[in-house]
């Protein structure tokens, strides 16, 4: 059975790794996801975090846990990692 976008998001936000992150990182993830383009990309992750009064360092937490992936470092573009899995985050760190 193919998972839908909602099912994938639910898998992510109910994962142990996600739930152990700071509230700022959790909120930033949801807002970045909501405000990204159709490919899940944005060049403003820190501005989005700041706009919701989350610590801009929460973006670093999302990157460290592989919930966000840098697509273009020079342009500052990140992508929401839609292929994220609990085991994946642990093996990649």
Go through the PLM ranges and name each one.
Residues 1-93:
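Positively charged, structured surface patches that bind polyanionic biopolymers
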């Amino acid at each position: 059975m193919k998972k839908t976008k909602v099912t994938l998001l639910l898998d992510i936000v109910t994962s142990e790794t996600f739930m152990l992150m700071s509230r700022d990182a959790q909120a930033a993830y949801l807002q970045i996801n909501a405000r990204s383009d159709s490919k899940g990309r944005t060049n403003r992750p820190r501005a989005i975090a700041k706009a919701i009064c989350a610590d801009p360092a929460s973006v670093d937490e999302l990157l460290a846990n592989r919930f966000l992936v840098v697509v273009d470092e020079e342009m500052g573009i990140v992508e929401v990692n839609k292929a994220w899995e609990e085991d994946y985050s642990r093996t990649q760190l």
